[in-house]
Design a protein with these regions (language model features):
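Short arginine-rich
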Residues: 169-172
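A mid-sequence, solvent-exposed acidic-amphipathic segment
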Residues: 105-136
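Conserved short S/T/G-enriched processing/targeting/catalytic segments and their helical context
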Residues: 1-105, 131, 136, 142-164
């Protein structure tokens, strides 16, 4: 299990979750790679730091996820080099949606981070659909995780509280 927030705090937790907080964005995921009843790998990376203000998570095909992460990292880096400015979180989510629309990738992605002092979080489906929300869960355990998120989330949540809720949602 892995929990990551924009302050590089790493803890152990279970399922893919993103939570916007008044002072940041918190991400959590299980670390097991599975296909149905088969556990393919016990320690799979599912949270990726794209740059110093954008993080993404993946649920789905490992190969597609690794490919998608490389493309997103390249697009964000190219933008920064060409424009001498950081790509916004919303722009990175839009680029990711466009990539997903261009071909079938069997992944569901959370992408979020901070633009200045504004936290934002997006869910991207395999067809490139993009939805912004304050908290999101993906993967097979998301139904149970949403129960915790809906019960505990509030607008003034801090990243410390968000970490606690993310771990609870993952372990639910």
């Amino acid at each position: 299990h892995e929990v990551f927030n924009m302050d590089d705090k790493i803890l152990e937790g279970t399922t893919t979750v993103g939570i916007t907080c008044k002072d940041g964005v918190v991400f959590a995921s299980e670390r097991r790679a599975s296909m149905g009843n088969l556990v393919a790998h016990k320690v799979a990376e599912k949270i990726f730091k794209i740059n110093d203000h954008i993080v993404t998570t993946i649920a789905g095909s490992v190969g597609d996820a690794q490919n998608l992460m490389k493309i997103i990292e390249a697009e964000v880096s190219l933008y920064q080099m060409r424009n001498n400015d950081k790509m916004s979180v919303k722009a990175a989510a839009s680029v990711t949606a466009n990539i997903l629309r261009s071909g079938p990738m069997y992944v569901q992605t959370l992408l979020g981070g901070m633009d200045g002092d504004k936290p934002s979080l997006y869910s991207l489906d395999p067809a490139g659909g993009m939805i912004e929300d304050t908290y999101i869960s993906t993967g097979s355990g998301s139904i149970v995780a949403y129960g915790v998120l809906e019960d505990r989330y509030h607008e003034e949540i801090t990243t410390d509280e968000g970490l606690e809720i993310a771990v609870r949602a993952i372990k639910a």
